[in-house]
Swiss-Prot record:
It is found in: Cytoplasm. Its EC number is 6.1.1.14. PROSITE patterns: AA_TRNA_LIGASE_II_GLYAB. The keyword ATP-binding applies. It is an enzyme of class 6 (ligase). GO terms for molecular function: arginine-tRNA ligase activity; ATP binding; glycine-tRNA ligase activity. It catalyses: tRNA(Gly) + glycine + ATP = glycyl-tRNA(Gly) + AMP + diphosphate. Belongs to the class-II aminoacyl-tRNA synthetase family. This is Glycine--tRNA ligase beta subunit. It comes from Streptococcus thermophilus (strain ATCC BAA-491 / LMD-9). The keyword Cytoplasm applies. Signal peptide: none annotated.
Length: 678
């Protein structure tokens, strides 16, 4: 016989960003709990609002499955003493399993007898097992937690109610001092306390007190209400999915409405208006059917449509205050001179251990010039890079960015264009912040990409130089994100700039403001980001590529992909083993010894020498692998007919030098001795 189980935890208002992950986590933790406790079920449903997390288990068995386990103990010769009685070892073994020596039997395993006992455990009732539900709730993890009242424990928010219903029976449990029952809380303003009749009536019981427990249903309500407004008003609403996910976790009973603002604010840049609406007010942007911004917005009320006109007016008033600020800053900022703002950056601290923003920009400018040369930019592009590097942080001192910091770079581009700066320079000012997330958009222009690289490289090197290095999950200065951006940009633009050589050249620069330090740590850190970009590539292939001599990001990622594909082919194992053998011996070579053909003693040496000298790895990574793998017979023949570690020291060193010459070329693809062929 099965029943449905409902568990609801009623809390104070949760942060919107916590709600969905917590709902998912509760479902996963409940599934794991039931699985570990051998309590079968058909399926699990989860629910959430800003003030509750809930899970319903459908078709829950009324009893655990019985458990029968065999346990292997000591060998018979250890289990019995000289008189044939059970030894202390045997007695201790069965006692540890809750059994007696009467339960012992001997079974033969690989020609020797061992003690075995079989333990039978009858399944407990579902009620007994479900007494562990408070442990499930306690196991939930949150990004933040708090204490309340005089309690010693902490949780995401204070807990007010707990419901555990097995069918229509309320189980008596306790979590953080809250005793379970069947009473839930309705909407904070429209509802009241409500008794949940049984596990199946949960959503409908809450609906009577203006709570929509199913987050997907709330989402659908919002979408449908927006569609109705679009049809009625002849507009289209810009639904940002991240904003929608946030909004639906701010409301328990959504009612969508449209408000408006004076058309005069449309003279303010669209980015300012959109940021004011989406980021600051959590409103959806409204456009006409041609995509032009309308003087309207969509918002979602946490409640019903009663007195909605008052809510509309209130929201309009709040937004207009924001737009007034935006209009004021837009007007006043245009009176400022870029050069004056740049000069003031000398008084703005980048970091107390590193110096000012001006000093950071000066170093980035030197790096940018070097990168522009290495990337083969035109003279015109180099000039744009140089100018952009001189001014690219100026907008941080504008009133608009001071009020709307999300617009840094974006406003810099607009103000630069108004001041007559070249379009390439203005675009680079915006693009140097990109990517602004792990998978965010990349710069589209070469000038912007070079400036982004330079800014991120100086940030990385500067923080490492003063010992501010990320550890564990702690990365307060977002250096992992910056480095991931460096790697992604280099890959996207296909610039063949070896990172080790680049970093080495940067450490050779001299600045009055700062001396770069911790070079080896920086290289390791960058390689870790390349490793991350390789995704699910097998670990040995990652290690082989990262241990190779080619630190061109695009080449490394291509090599990892090519090796992953090659590993599926028949000839991979033999070819890799041949190359690995060469790699392992080459490590013993004296790098100062040159290959001397007069010391060759057999045709196989000569053949390998000819191959090593003529080998020019060209084309794609797959092409290079093919060129290396075809050498496998030549390498094998060499090893079959040649004693590398010969007694004659000169001959031995010559053979090691020969292998080293071959390996040096192969290592530009990967360190093949790091690959696993088992």
């Amino acid at each position: 016989m099965t029943k449905n189980l409902l568990v609801e935890l009623g809390l104070e208002e949760l942060p919107a960003y916590v709600v969905t992950p917590s709902e998912k986590q509760l479902g996963e933790k409940m599934a794991a709990f039931l699985g570990e406790n051998r309590l079968s079920y058909e399926s699990i449903q989860t629910f959430s609002t800003p003030r509750r997390l809930a899970v319903r288990v459908l078709g829950l068995a009324d009893q655990q499955t019985d458990l029968t386990e065999d346990f292997k103990g000591p060998s018979k010769k250890i289990a019995l003493d000289a008189d044939g009685n059970f030894s202390k070892a045997a007695q201790g073994f069965v006692r540890g399993k809750g059994l007696t020596v009467d339960d012992i039997e001997f079974r033969e395993v690989k020609g020797e007898e061992y003690v075995y006992v079989t333990k039978h455990e009858a399944g407990k009732s579902a009620k007994e097992v479900l007494a562990g539900i408070p442990e499930v709730l306690a196991s939930l993890t949150f990004p933040v937690s708090m204490h309340w009242a005089n309690n010693s424990f902490e949780y995401i928010r204070p807990v007010h109610t707990l419901i555990v219903l097995l069918g229509d029976e309320a189980l008596e449990l306790d979590f953080l001092g809250i005793k379970s029952g069947r009473v839930s809380r309705g909407h904070r303003f429209l509802g009241h306390e409500v008794e949940i009749t049984n596990a199946d009536s949960y959503e409908e019981d809450l609906r009577t007190v203006y709570v929509i427990a199913d987050s997907k249903e709330r989402e659908n309500m919002i979408r449908e209400q927006i569609k109705a407004i679009e049809a009625e008003q002849g507009v289209q609403v810009q639904i940002e999915e991240g904003l929608l996910n946030e909004v639906l976790n701010l409301v328990e009973y959504p009612t969508t409405f449209m408000g408006g603002f004076d058309t005069k604010y449309l003279d303010v840049p669209e980015d300012v208006l959109v940021t004011s609406m989406e980021t600051h007010q959590r409103y959806f942007v409204v456009r006409d059917l041609d995509g032009r911004l309308k003087p309207n917005f969509i918002s979602v009320r946490n409640g019903n449509a009663e007195h909605l006109e008052n809510v509309v007016r209130g929201n309009e008033k709040v937004l207009v205050a924001r737009l007034e600020d935006g209009e004021f800053f837009w007007r006043e900022d245009q009176k400022l001179k870029i050069e004056d703002l740049v000069a003031k950056l000398a008084n703005v601290t980048f970091h107390e251990k590193i110096g000012s923003l001006s000093e950071h920009m000066a170093r980035a400018g030197v790096i940018a010039a070097s990168l522009a040369e290495k990337a083969g930019l035109t003279a015109e592009e180099k000039a744009a890079v140089a100018r952009a590097a001189e001014i690219y942080k100026f907008d941080l001192l504008t009133g608009m960015v001071g009020e709307f910091d999300e617009l840094q770079g974006i406003m810099g581009e607009k103000y630069a264009l108004l001041a007559g700066e070249d379009e390439a320079v203005a675009t680079a000012i915006r693009e140097h912040y990109l990517p602004d997330s792990a998978d965010g958009a990349l710069p589209e222009t070469k000038v912007g990409a070079i400036l982004a690289l330079a800014d991120k490289l100086d940030t990385l090197l500067s923080f490492f130089s003063v010992g501010l290095i990320p550890s564990g999950s702690n990365d307060p200065y977002a250096l992992r994100r910056a480095t991931q951006g460096i790697v992604r940009i280099l890959d996207a633009f296909g610039w063949h700039i070896p990172m080790d050589e680049l970093i080495d050249s940067l450490y050779g620069l001299s600045f009055d403001s700062l001396s770069y330090d911790n070079q080896a740590e920086v290289i390791r850190f960058i390689k870790a980001r390349v490793d991350k970009m390789m995704g699910s590539t097998p670990k040995d292939i990652k290690e082989a590529v990262l241990s190779g001599s080619n630190f061109v990001v695009a080449d490394m990622l291509e090599a990892a992909e090519a090796l992953s594909e090659a590993a599926k082919t028949d000839g991979y194992k033999a070819a890799v083993e041949s190359l690995s053998r060469a790699f392992n011996l080459a490590e013993k070579a004296d790098t100062s010894v040159a290959v001397d053909a007069s010391l060759f003693e057999n045709d196989q040496e000569k053949a390998l020498a000819q191959v090593a000298e003529s080998l020019e790895l060209t084309g794609s990574a797959s092409d290079k692998l093919a060129q290396l793998f075809v050498l496998s017979p030549v390498i094998d023949a060499f090893f079959d007919n040649t004693m590398v570690m010969a007694d004659d020291v000169a001959v031995k060193n010559n053979r090691l030098a020969l292998l080293s010459a071959l390996v040096a070329k192969a290592k530009t693809v990967a360190a093949f001795n790091q690959l696993n062929t088992k």
